[in-house]
Design a protein with these regions (language model features):
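Extracytoplasmic
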Residues: 30-50, 58, 81
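Short hydrophobic/alpha-helical segments at membrane-entry points of transmembrane helices
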Residues: 31, 115-121
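Residue-level signature of mid-helix packing/kink "hotspots" within the transmembrane helices
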Residues: 43, 71-79, 162-163
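Conserved MFS/SLC helix-loop-helix module at the cytosolic interface between two early adjacent transmembrane helices
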Residues: 76-114
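MFS 12-TM fold signature
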Residues: 100-105, 124, 188-191
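Cytoplasmic helix-loop-helix junction between adjacent transmembrane helices
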Residues: 120-157
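Helix-loop-helix hairpin linking two adjacent transmembrane segments in secondary transporters
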Residues: 154-191
Length: 191
């Protein structure tokens, strides 16, 4: 992709010269949809904490530990993965992240114990941490120089998924029980 710097009102803008606008929209849109699906899955976990608490007779400390494991793996791992993939781009990490999330969903749906819930939370977090840095990089690369538009479109996808996840949990998982979490695998497969 060839880029040039243009000044408009004293502000530098990078503009792609040779990437078709339709291709930019399709790629950024696809990454935003994948972000929606990823974050939808991530948002279901905290939404079902009350169900997990009841099913496993967990204390609030144990629910907090589930959240801690998920957040440590899902948040604190991201910068390290981003640092590595900035030096060694790995586009295949997008589907790898979704496969790891897929495994976490299956474990969560059929978890027989608190220890397995922790493993499921860790896998869901690792899947998210693996997905986000590469997906963000792809959105930027496909932006055609419109970095702000690409990033905001990517972010809207994730925020929409975060908004839909708890609603999906209330409508489909809570009425049918913990095993209904397995239905989320379709989102991991689509992502």
């Amino acid at each position: 992709m060839t880029s040039s710097i243009q000044l408009k009102d004293g502000i530098a803008n990078t503009v792609a010269n040779d990437q078709p606008q339709g291709m930019i929209i399709k790629i950024v849109g696809a990454v935003a949809v994948a972000h929606l699906l990823n974050d939808l899955i991530q948002a279901v976990l905290p939404a079902i904490y009350p169900m997990l608490k009841a099913n496993f007779s967990l204390s609030f400390a144990q629910v907090g530990l589930i959240s801690f494991v998920y957040q440590i793996t899902g948040s604190l791992l991201q910068p390290w993965i981003g640092l590595y993939t900035d030096k060694h781009p790995k586009p295949y990490l997008l589907p790898v992240g979704m496969v790891v999330t897929f495994c976490g969903i299956i474990l969560l749906a059929f978890s027989p114990s608190f220890a397995v819930l922790l493993c499921a939370s860790a896998l869901i977090g690792v899947g998210s941490a693996t997905f986000h840095p590469e997906a963000s990089r792809v959105a930027r690369m496909a932006s055609g120089g419109r970095f702000g538009t690409a990033q905001s479109t990517f972010q809207v996808g994730g925020n929409t998924g975060t908004a839909i996840g708890p609603l999906l949990a209330a409508l489909l998982i809570v009425p049918f029980g913990q095993h209904a979490v397995a239905g989320l695998v379709i989102f991991a497969l689509l992502g």
